[in-house]
């Protein structure tokens, strides 16, 4: 039988062992994540937006064919891409996306955005107010149906402040896709971050996206990682990317390893600038 002093010493040794194990596990994850980010060859940063025109970009607005910039939804003004509703009377479900011309596989993307302080259209749904996003790993605009509201993609969601309720920017959403977070398939269409700010409209925010060759993805807001996930696959059971079922079923639940980048128009004016990309390759 152990004496009381032996018992206390044994408990301390056990607690120390657990703490040490937890610390080593954490360090291993940190080192692994760092290694994943470091074990790539990075090309030069280059602009996707020239600051003057929409050359290289293709609009796709729901209910309209690819290439039609309906009511000049996407305009360039003083070095920014602006989502404008000046020509609209109502939104009428006409969500839009502005696609860059070529798909990408592994890269870092950075841009700056701000929601304008003037409100959206009167029939913009409550969830879509002060709401936009960066779509990536996306299908092409030409492969979308005319009525399709959202492309099959991953969305780096951008939110502005609405009312007094916390509304952190930087969620990840999955129209037509699945992802895993900490090895578990995300159940909700959108997963909000736990450490991102609620940003008042009119404030410029820096958004950064990293898509590694091994399929790991990180999202940053103002330099802080707000999401890390992996394993992008198509979701045959999706109900969000309306009209995309044939596109998804033709490909099965396959892993998504590349795709297009698009900027979203979802019912509220927003501006984007300094859109740049750095392509990555495995060593």
Please provide the spans of the model-predicted regions.
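Bacterial N-terminal signal peptides
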Residues: 17-30
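Carbohydrate-interacting regions of secretory-pathway proteins
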Residues: 35-283
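N-terminal secretory signal peptides that target proteins for export/translocation
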Residues: 1-16
């Amino acid at each position: 039988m152990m004496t009381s002093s032996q018992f206390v010493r044994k408990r301390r040794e056990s607690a120390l062992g657990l703490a040490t194990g937890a610390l080593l596990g954490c360090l291993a994850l940190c080192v692994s994540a760092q290694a994943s980010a470091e074990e790539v060859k990075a090309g030069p940063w280059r602009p996707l937006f020239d600051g003057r025109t929409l050359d290289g970009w293709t609009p796709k607005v729901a209910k309209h064919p690819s290439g039609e910039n309906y009511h000049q939804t996407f305009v360039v003004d003083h070095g920014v891409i602006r989502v404008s509703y000046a020509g609209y009377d109502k939104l009428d479900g006409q969500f839009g996306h502005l696609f860059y011309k070529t798909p990408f596989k592994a890269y870092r993307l950075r841009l700056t955005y701000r929601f304008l302080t003037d409100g959206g259209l009167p029939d913009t749904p409550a969830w879509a107010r002060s709401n936009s996003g960066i779509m990536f790993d996306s299908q092409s605009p030409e492969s979308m149906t005319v009525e399709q509201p959202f492309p099959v993609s991953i969305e780096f969601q951008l939110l502005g402040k609405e009312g007094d309720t916390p509304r952190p920017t930087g969620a990840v959403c999955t129209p037509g896709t699945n992802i895993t977070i900490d090895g578990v398939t995300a159940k909700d269409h959108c997963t909000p971050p736990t450490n991102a700010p609620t940003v008042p409209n009119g404030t410029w925010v820096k958004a950064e996206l990293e898509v590694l060759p091994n399929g790991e993805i990180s999202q940053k807001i103002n330099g802080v990682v707000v999401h890390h996930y992996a394993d992008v696959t198509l979701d045959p059971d999706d109900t969000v990317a309306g009209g995309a079922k044939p596109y998804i079923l033709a490909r099965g639940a396959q892993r998504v390893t590349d795709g297009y980048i698009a900027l979203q128009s979802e019912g509220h004016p927003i501006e984007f600038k300094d859109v740049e990309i750095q392509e990555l390759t495995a060593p």
